[in-house]
Amino acid sequence: INLLSKGVFMTTKLNKIADYWNQRSSGYSLDNQEELLNDQEKWLKLIHTYVPLKKDLKVLDLGCGPGFLSILLSKQGCQVTGIDYSNQMLEEAKHNAKENNVHTDFKKMDVQELTFDDESFDFVITRNVTWNLEKPKQAYQEIYRVLKNKGHLLNIDGNHYYHYQDHDYQRNGHSDHQHM
């Protein structure tokens, strides 16, 4: 594969991923709205375990989807930029941020090719993203490039289809993701 065709392949795959999430955006947004109503304290406790949140912390939310983490961290006084490759997810995120009276900067961007300057963010957070990536190593290189010296990365992720592959795992009630 030459470099040109490799780039075309990645763009095609990214577009397929974006199409998938565009189709699921409204339902996924409803789930996130419910989380904003019911689970904020749980998520803040988890985040505080790893990262000391303070006002004006510059945060990058990778694969922000409908904006759950972006909104949650904006409510804490952080300056949040949320990125996603799905136009519909970004529209849901903007709507949800407005409904929650917070300002967050949302941008369309590939997490594997970030357009931010080096050392732009104090904290990078991502949830349910890296397990989907074709080139996670490239994404991690980009994350570390945009993180400030002594910055923090919190990657909340898992293999969400493992229960389909391991029947003992499924029988033990691990298909609901609460144990992750």
Where does each model-flagged region fall?
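Nucleotide donor/acceptor-binding cores
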Residues: D56-K58
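A short glycine-rich, Lys/Arg-flanked "PGG" loop and its adjoining helix->strand segment in the class I
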Residues: K137-H152
